[in-house]
Amino acid sequence: MSNSGKKLTQKLKKNLPVTGPQAPTLYELMQWYCLNTNTHGCRRIVVSKGRLRRWIWIVLTLIAVALIFWQCALLLMTYYSVSASITVTFQKLVYPAVTICNLNPYSYSKIKDRLATLEKTTNQTLKKIYGFTEPLIRSKRDLDVNDENSTEDIFLKQIPLFRLESIKGNQLVVSDLKTKKRTQISGKVIQRDAGSVQDSDNMVGFKLCDANNSSDCTIFTFGSGVNAIQEWYRLHYNNILAKISMEDKIAMGYKADELIVTCLFDGLSCDARNFTLFHHPLYGNCYTFNSAERGNLLVSSMGGAEYGLKVVLYIDEDEYNPYLSTAAGAKILVHDQDEYPFIEDLGTELETGTETSIGMQLTESTKLSDPYSDCTIDGSDISVENLYNKKYTLQICLNSCFQREMVRSCGCAHYDQPLPNGAKYCNYEEYPNWIYCYVKLYKQFVQEELGCQSTCRESCSFKEWTLTRSLAKWPSLNSEEWMLRVLSWELGEKLNKNLTKNDLGNLNIFYQDLNSRSISESPTYNIVTLLSNFGGQLGLWMSCSMVCGLEIVEVFFIDSFWVILRQKWHKLCNWWKNRKENEIEEIPDITVPAMAGHNNPLCVDHPICLGEDDPPTFHSALQLPQAQDCRVPRTPPPKYNTLRIQSAFHLETIDSDEDVERF
């Protein structure tokens, strides 16, 4: 009985193996765990076929376990450290670049010889318009304004000035200021001042016509003769400056030690050597404090009026051009070191005889590029060439685009903007039609017909300083006398007159505090958030992790691909087998038909074939029939059921499947 019981137990163990904690060996226990656990990855180690797949899943599972231990260790260390963090930071802001320009671009004593004829013509024109009898400029200009014969009328020929008297239909009745003849003119009217041409009498203007087509004209009208003369004067002024070399223009401008009298920064003394020359086409010699060309940038350690830049500027109002600069003072612009100072558009003006205090607040803005916005990072993806050699800005792109169109349409470059390679500045002698071309092109630019506004895009990052300005009378009555004496002594030989407070301006520019504001864009839904949300949904509803995702990839992409490939292979093999069988069945089964009588070729001249009743004799039986010239169909090859060609294909298919499973 004992032997039979042992045999029964062994048979049960063989047919029904014990699993789980009752497994007899550690290998069987691990195998059972991997087959029944909810931990992803372990089951794939057991069920995967092929050593390569098995080792891949072993490595992935071990890496996941190592990451879990590492992260848990960090969490435990952080939890049991029982520490509190206190952060105290002392911030220092880089002091921005400050560009300072005199509103008068050139000393009149240095440029008067080049502008003498233009100034005479302008002065005489004003006398004709308003009937002045006294000289309109001071005698120190050394101009004989009463000698009309000495004044050339070339400027009035190029751009004729007129007085608008009346309107008849679509034509204007004007009085030419040179010939005093009344004529009717027609063309496109551009009103540069507020109001309407129909509602204004005695308006002043000038006419620009195409040199190649005199009937194509543009008429500019102004409600005030001051604005008309200034606009007319500036057109001729730019034409004269376009023919002067850069070296001569720098020599005619103000030097740093002439413009800057005293300087303090952060409580320390500075001088003209801390300023960098920057020549502006409209304001002449300007000077930039804390420029990147000086090397290390200065920083502000504290906020407040005592820790900024303090300068006293010598304006020298007596050297002002009366028709170009009608306001006296200076203009400043706060900007980043790698930005071009568009001081004519963004600058802040300083008055003479006052102390101007400007508090700054820095704002840094950063926008997201494509696909969140249409901004550009550095302008490299813009088709417009940067003519300023500075950091890309929208204003740089627009000006460069207009200058490019100016060179393409008019053949020359405008004086107010940088010169492109291979181009020349416009002047009457070489390009007599440039002013009309410029006015027409600028109108198209303003109306966004040149495509510059659609081509140029905003920069994704930029810095902006918000300025708060306050004014005070400077110097005071009690301190005026001694301060002017001291400053006159410091100017020394540069000063050839008695100094007054209207010749000076005091500037104090500083950070209000060292708190900068940062405005940045961030995507509300990025790839990290997307993956986290996907992982949360899969873990909540399917208890699925990253390893589970890899299992899905293996089954639904890799294994499914091989299953479909095997199915296609089986179909191909079956098609090949059926094709071979069909080829065998198409061969016809040819047999010799039974023929009797004279239709049988073997019975020719035979007694039996002749139908004779008597049996053949021995002699007639020996007479064999002659061979007939006829082809007897050959017997087809036999069909052997033992030739099983499909079995060979079946064996190849089995081998191929085994090869696939080995992967």
From Swiss-Prot:
Residues 1-55, 566-663 are cytoplasmic. It catalyses: Na(+)(in) = Na(+)(out). Disulfide bonds join 101-286, 209-217, 263-270, 375-460, 397-456, 401-452, 410-437, 412-426. It comes from the Eukaryota. It is found in: Apical cell membrane. Residues 77-544 are extracellular. GO terms for molecular function: ligand-gated sodium channel activity. It is a multi-pass membrane protein. The chain crosses the membrane at residues 56-76, 545-565. Originally identified and characterized by its inhibition by the diuretic drug amiloride. Keywords: Cell membrane, Disulfide bond, Ion channel, Ion transport, Membrane, Sodium, Sodium channel, Sodium transport, Transmembrane, Transmembrane helix, Transport. Component of the heterotrimeric epithelial sodium channel (ENaC) composed of an alpha/SCNN1A, a beta/SCNN1B and a gamma/SCNN1G subunit. This is one of the three pore-forming subunits of the heterotrimeric epithelial sodium channel (ENaC), a critical regulator of sodium balance and fluid homeostasis. ENaC operates in epithelial tissues, where it mediates the electrodiffusion of sodium ions from extracellular fluid through the apical membrane of cells, with water following osmotically. Belongs to the amiloride-sensitive sodium channel (TC 1.A.6) family. SCNN1G subfamily. This is Epithelial sodium channel subunit gamma-2. The gene is scnn1g-b.
